[in-house]
Structures are given as C-alpha cells and as structure tokens.
C-alpha cells in the first residue's frame, strides 16, 4: 500500500532538502507531529534514528535508510507486522521545486493497517506536505519583479 502527495514550492531543492533533514523542527511545520527527537548527534546520516510522536498514533522509532543531498530523505519504522517507509523527494521545477512525499506500508499486516489507519496516513501526509511547502516558500527569495511598462 502506498500514499503519495505532491506540491510545488518557490524555494530551491536545496532549501526544501534542508527542511527534510531538520527533523526536530517538523512539529513547527505541521500539526501531524507532536515531537521528533533525534537519538544521535551530528549531521543526519544513513543509520540516524529519531523517536516520532504523532496524534492518535503510538510513538515510533524511525531509522534513516537513504540520503541523496538536495534530493531525497528516506526513513523507515517497523512494528506490529508492518514496515512503513517515509520517502521525501524534491526535484527542480522551473525556478522552484516539486515536493513529493510517499508513505509505503509492507508486511503481513499492512493490508489491515492500511484499512484501519489509511485515513490518518493520508491526512497526515497532506498536512506534512503543506508544512514543507509553506516553510519552503517562506524561506524562498522573492521573485524578481517585472520592470515597469513604459
């Protein structure tokens, strides 16, 4: 089972990627996160872990599995017969970026979990996408204005 949401932002891919990897800031960007606490120090890297607390969900320990600077941040968590992968992708789109968030569930109980939690997963993905888009747009330099007609 997979959920995918996409939006465009005026910020560069590098600006969006910085938001992706600043996981402890995520609760400032979206109400779908109560807290994110890194379990290691230093720059985020493959193998880094964090405890994520979200409304209506049990706390989950997420481990970074893939980093492509200025492009992709992927992490996963497992429990209760389900492995969940969260993929955060940013691509150039004209002067700005295309942001894609995907959530994939697999494992013996993923179908049942999808039925029980699919609505929450879709809502939270949309909230998180809007949080990243809004924060990226706020950080983007203003678009150049057109010269006066004359």
Where would I find each of the regions flagged by the language model?
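Short beta-strand segments that buttress and anchor functional surface loops
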Residues: 48-55, 73-79
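Intrinsic-disorder/low-complexity, polar/charged segments enriched in Ser/Thr/Lys/Arg/Asp/Glu/Gln
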Residues: 1-6, 49, 59, 72, ...
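Hydrophobic ligand-binding cavity/cleft-lining segments
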Residues: 1-42, 137, 147-150
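A short, structured loop/turn motif at beta-sheet edges
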Residues: 13-14, 41, 66-70, 89-98
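Beta-strand elements of well-folded, non-transmembrane domains
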Residues: 11, 56-58, 105-109
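A conserved amphipathic terminal alpha-helix motif
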Residues: 104-150
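Hydrophobic/aromatic beta-strand elements that line small-molecule binding cavities or substrate pockets
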Residues: 5-7, 61-66, 77, 84-92
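Short, solvent-exposed aromatic-acidic interface loops
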Residues: 78-82, 102-108
């Amino acid at each position: 089972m997979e959920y995918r949401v996409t939006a465009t932002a005026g910020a560069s891919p590098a600006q969006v990627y910085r938001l992706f990897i600043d996981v402890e800031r995520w609760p400032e960007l979206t109400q779908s996160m109560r807290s994110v606490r890194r379990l290691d120090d230093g720059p985020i890297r493959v193998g880094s872990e964090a405890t994520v607390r979200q409304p209506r969900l049990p706390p989950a320990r997420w481990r970074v599995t893939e980093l492509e600077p200025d492009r992709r941040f992927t992490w996963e968590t497992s429990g209760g017969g389900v492995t969940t992968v969260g993929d955060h992708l940013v691509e150039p789109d004209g002067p700005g970026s295309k942001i894609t968030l995907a959530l994939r569930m697999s494992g013996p109980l993923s179908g049942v979990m999808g039925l029980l939690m699919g609505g929450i997963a879709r809502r939270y993905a949309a909230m998180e996408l809007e949080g990243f888009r809004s924060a990226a747009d706020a950080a983007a330099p203003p678009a150049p204005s057109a010269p006066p007609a004359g």
